[in-house]
């Protein structure tokens, strides 16, 4: 999505990228976007997740199962979670992807009723490992209305290295 485009647009900011989706149409769009942002060749058709370049792994995959691949677990400094209807539910299965040898970051989007935001904040904090000392606890920020009763929110969490 747009967050990845912004990150890839910054010189020398992004190293390896892992991107997956279960939806073939979303993967096709991802590959089109990577082609534009990276100015590299990418497949035109979605396929199961694989290494497409030395520093790019992308394709069709269930993100909740990636933690079981020893080549992917524990390697990533940042997670961008853009499944707003399921972010809180799947966070525990994504955390094992983080490289906990140093600080890392999780950014996500959540759809929640405004009255439920404080409970969603608690659920996010519970799902994540200890946060980096001195950084604020993750807290949902309303980005825009999703419907008459629901809000599209975002959060950011700095994760402490494992002891």
Kindly give the residue locations of the regions a language model identified:
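Conserved SAM-binding loop of SAM-dependent methyltransferases across substrates and taxa
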Residues: 1-14
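Phosphate- and divalent-cation-binding pockets in alpha/beta enzyme and binding domains
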Residues: 6, 29, 89
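A generic alpha-to-beta junction signature in SAM-dependent methyltransferases
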Residues: 11, 38, 98-100
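Residue-level signal for beta-strand positions within conserved beta-sheet cores that form or flank
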Residues: 13, 52-54, 102, 136
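Residues at the starts of beta-strands that form the adenosine-phosphate
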Residues: 15-16, 105
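S-adenosyl-L-methionine
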Residues: 16-76, 86
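C-terminal catalytic and target-recognition region of SAM-dependent MTase-like enzymes
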Residues: 64-65, 72-77, 84-163
């Amino acid at each position: 999505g747009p967050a990845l485009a912004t990150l890839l647009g910054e010189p020398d900011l992004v190293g390896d990228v892992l991107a997956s989706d279960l939806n073939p149409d979303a993967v096709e769009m991802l590959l089109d976007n990577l082609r534009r942002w990276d100015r590299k060749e990418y497949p035109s058709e979605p396929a199961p997740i694989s290494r497409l370049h030395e520093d790019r792994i992308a394709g069709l995959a269930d993100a909740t199962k990636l933690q079981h691949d020893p080549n992917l677990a524990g390697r990533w400094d940042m997670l961008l979670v853009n499944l707003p209807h399921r972010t809180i539910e799947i966070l525990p299965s994504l955390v094992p992807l983080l490289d906990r040898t140093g600080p890392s970051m999780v950014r996500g989007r959540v759809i929640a009723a405004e009255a439920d935001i404080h409970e969603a904040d608690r659920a996010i904090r519970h799902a994540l490992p200890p946060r980096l000392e001195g950084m604020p606890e993750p807290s949902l920020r309303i980005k825009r209305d999703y419907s008459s009763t629901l809000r599209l929110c975002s959060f950011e969490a700095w994760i402490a290295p494992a002891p």
